[in-house]
Design a protein with these regions (language model features):
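Acidic/histidine-rich catalytic neighborhood of metal-dependent amide-processing enzymes
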Residues: 1-77, 114, 190-202
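Residues at or immediately flanking beta-strands
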Residues: 18-22, 127, 285-287
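Short, internal active-site loops enriched in acidic
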Residues: 27-31, 144, 294-296
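Short acidic, glycine/proline-rich loop/turn micro-motifs
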Residues: 35, 97, 316-320
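Acidic-enriched catalytic cores of C-N bond-cleaving enzymes acting on peptides and small amides
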Residues: 62-88, 93-144, 148-208, 235-250
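An extended, acidic, His-containing surface patch that forms the Zn2+-binding/catalytic region
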Residues: 149-220, 225, 229-244, 250-345
């Protein structure tokens, strides 16, 4: 809306311009970008020479890491003193799971399990619940969601749940699944335990989010969904090759959608113009940034993300009650109006 009204300001003022502006609105940014892929493949128009997406933060995002989702596959059969029936967590690969639930049977009483559970949740400062349902037990852990590009800002409910369950005598596929989640993925945001950690001087370090967990003992294809934000210097196949070395993983597959690393140099006129306007209007020093998140800015060779979140703003993106202050939208609209005019005058 801030960009829309910025264009309206330019139009209503009758300012002279020398370039055309294309206002492209996408609605699938969180679910694969199928709309943009279709649009650019079928619109019959030359791609814009440059552009920006108002889907990030100021002062600018002129670099975005690569983005690939890879799936670890596991068997399901397990029988023993402890048997894992189901384990589920997460809604999307690009979100830290806020809650996780497992159903299992155990050669223990509810009281015995609750004693261990109380000690674990107290030590980890977790909100959680353990109840008995017939012959089985249901355990739920509540964490904190966060954007998949910054998993360290969240609390992954799935890995904490696995950490609790991994102390018990599960066997077979359940043991492998819980071991992987609790001992390989837990708190490993850089992929060090996976053997895929990598850092580039310009784009920074690889990050990993374990986003979706699906396990059913009656299924022979259970999965853990891992989302990687990777810098230039590594790639999806290199990551896959390392994941295939994990003990007990039956297969590793890749998502159909991948974004390779994207970078527009700081001395590009687009970047320098946007930063100049930002500095003029805010009085703050502009600087380039590379992020693990993905924006529509990367759809253009000379595309960046520009706003609309300000540096002093509390980031609630992908969290409950996500919001933006109206006053900040006004501030952003003013910046966009001047920036757009400088680019098209």
């Amino acid at each position: 809306m801030a960009c829309y009204y910025a264009l309206k300001i330019i139009k209503d003022l009758g300012l002279p311009v020398s370039k055309r502006v294309r206002f492209i609105v996408g609605t699938d940014e969180e679910s694969g970008w199928g709309d943009m892929e279709y649009y650019f493949a079928h619109n019959g128009l030359k791609d814009p020479d440059f552009g920006f997406s108002p889907d990030a933060e100021f002062p600018i995002i002129n670099g975005e890491k690569g983005n690939i989702t890879e799936y670890l596959h596991f068997a399901g059969e397990n029988n023993g003193a402890f048997t894992l029936n189901t384990f589920e967590a997460g809604l999307r690969d690009n979100m830290v799971p806020e809650s996780a639930t497992a159903v299992f049977t155990a050669d223990s009483t509810l009281a015995e399990l609750q004693e261990k559970f109380a000690a674990f949740t107290a030590a980890e400062n977790l909100k959680a619940e353990l109840v008995q349902e017939g012959d089985a037990f249901r355990v739920t852990v509540i964490g904190k969601s966060a954007h998949g590009s910054t998993p360290e800002l969240g609390l992954n409910a799935a890995t904490y749940l696995a950490k609790f369950l991994d102390q018990f005598a599960f066997n077979g596929a359940a043991k492998v699944y819980l071991d992987t989640t609790a001992n390989v993925l837990h708190q490993d945001f850089a992929g060090e335990n996976l053997g895929v950690a990598y850092t580039d001087a310009k784009m920074g370090a690889l990050s990993m989010n374990a986003g979706v967990f699906k396990f059913d003992r009656n299924s022979n294809d259970n999965t853990i969904t891992l989302n990687f934000r990777y810098p230039q210097g590594t790639d999806a196949q290199t990551i896959k090759a390392e994941l295939e070395k994990l003990d007990g993983v039956t297969a590793v597959t890749l998502s159909e959608h991948e974004h390779t690393p994207h970078y527009v140099p700081a001395d590009d006129p687009l970047v320098s113009t946007l930063l100049s306007v930002y500095e003029k209007q805010t009085g703050l020093k502009g600087y380039e940034q590379v992020i693990g998140g993905g924006t529509f800015g990367r759809l253009l060779k000379r595309g960046v993300a520009f706003g609309a979140m300000f540096p002093d703003y509390v980031n609630t993106m992908h969290q409950a009650n996500e919001f933006a202050d109206v006053e900040d939208l006004y501030r952003a609209a003013a910046i966009y109006a001047e920036a757009l005019y400088e680019l098209i005058k």
